[in-house]
């Protein structure tokens, strides 16, 4: 629980640590229908072409994305193809790339990193391993009750940075079981950013049985961190890319954050205080950015 209190307390920080980035995003979606009632197949028929059982359908695209915090995206489709009958719209890869566990909710289910996570989940430490210069902690996530708004599985945490390394979660929905896998990488100066996503869903509803999969991968070309959120909270464990932002004298709130993080064990009160302080830090960084514009 000590690990998770630090991760949850710093979720707002990691959610807002990037100011801008440019990236190339590849996305591929596939669908295979094991069982498809004729009435439903008829409804999605286009020009006498209908979706068939035991045939794989695919859509994929290569995209160039420019991101500007907090939520501005400029996307250019470089290439795309689609074999799904009647489906002409391009899928926006940002719908999947933006699915961050640092948010309170993702598509209606409560994130295990939400401020209220301890009300919904039990966490257990199941060991650790070394990757490069980092210690990675394996945390089991178990919902306290059965609900379509809760997930279960594993999250992996980068120790001392208290950020996500990866996740392997499943959610039981009314339409079937959804599996969510994410992988993060140390892209710049110990800032771990998402580099791959996989959503796999076994659908069983209204007589339909199918498997639907989306995978996406990101290759970052340029990344600029939020200069108003200091990296001094963490001891640097690798050189990374890019230059260290100019250091500023820590504010009173930043000193309080540092004091909490230096504690060996955090209690729930410390976690709530850390989360609140970090929320103020993010708001202050946004105000400072607006004043410079």
Regions found by a protein language model. Give the residues of each.
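Outer-membrane beta-barrel proteins
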Residues: 17, 36, 171-178, 183
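Short, surface-exposed coil-to-beta transition loops
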Residues: 149-153, 177-181, 213-215
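A conserved hydrophobic secondary-structure block that centers on an alpha-helix together
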Residues: 135-136, 142-154, 158, 163-170
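Beta-strand-dense domains in secreted/periplasmic systems and polymorphic toxin scaffolds
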Residues: 167, 195-197
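Solvent-exposed loop/turn segments connecting transmembrane beta-strands
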Residues: 33, 147-150, 172-177, 209
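Structured extracytoplasmic
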Residues: 1-138, 144-150, 214-293
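Extended lipid/amphipathic-ligand handling interfaces
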Residues: 153, 159, 179-190, 220
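Outer-membrane beta-barrel translocator/channel fold
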Residues: 198-216
């Amino acid at each position: 629980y000590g690990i998770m209190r630090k991760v949850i307390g710093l979720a707002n920080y990691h959610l807002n640590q990037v100011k801008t980035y440019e990236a190339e995003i590849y996305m591929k979606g596939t669908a295979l229908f094991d069982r498809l009632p004729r009435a439903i197949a008829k409804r999605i028929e286009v020009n006498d072409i209908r979706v068939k059982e035991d045939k794989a359908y695919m859509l994929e695209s290569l995209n160039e994305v420019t991101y500007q915090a907090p939520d501005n995206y400029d996307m250019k489709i470089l290439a795309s193809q689609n074999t799904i009958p009647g489906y002409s719209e391009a899928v926006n890869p940002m719908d999947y790339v933006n699915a961050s566990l640092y948010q309170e909710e993702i598509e209606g289910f409560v994130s295990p990193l939400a401020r209220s996570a301890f009300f919904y989940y039990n966490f257990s430490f199941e060991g650790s391993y070394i990757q490069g210069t980092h210690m990675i902690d394996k945390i089991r996530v178990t919902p306290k009750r059965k609900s379509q708004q809760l997930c279960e599985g594993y999250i992996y945490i980068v120790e001392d940075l208290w950020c996500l390394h990866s996740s392997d979660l499943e959610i039981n929905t009314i339409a079937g079981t959804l599996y969510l896998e994410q992988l993060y990488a140390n892209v710049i100066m110990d800032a771990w950013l998402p580099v791959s996503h996989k959503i796999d869903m076994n659908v069983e509803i209204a007589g339909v049985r199918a498997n639907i999969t989306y995978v996406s991968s990101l290759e970052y070309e340029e990344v600029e961190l939020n200069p108003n959120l200091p990296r001094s909270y963490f001891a640097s464990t690798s050189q990374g890319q890019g230059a260290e932002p100019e250091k500023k004298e820590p504010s009173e709130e930043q000193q309080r954050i540092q004091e909490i993080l230096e504690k060996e064990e955090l209690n729930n009160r410390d976690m709530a205080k850390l989360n609140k302080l970090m929320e103020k830090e993010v708001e202050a960084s946004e105000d400072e950015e607006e004043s410079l514009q």
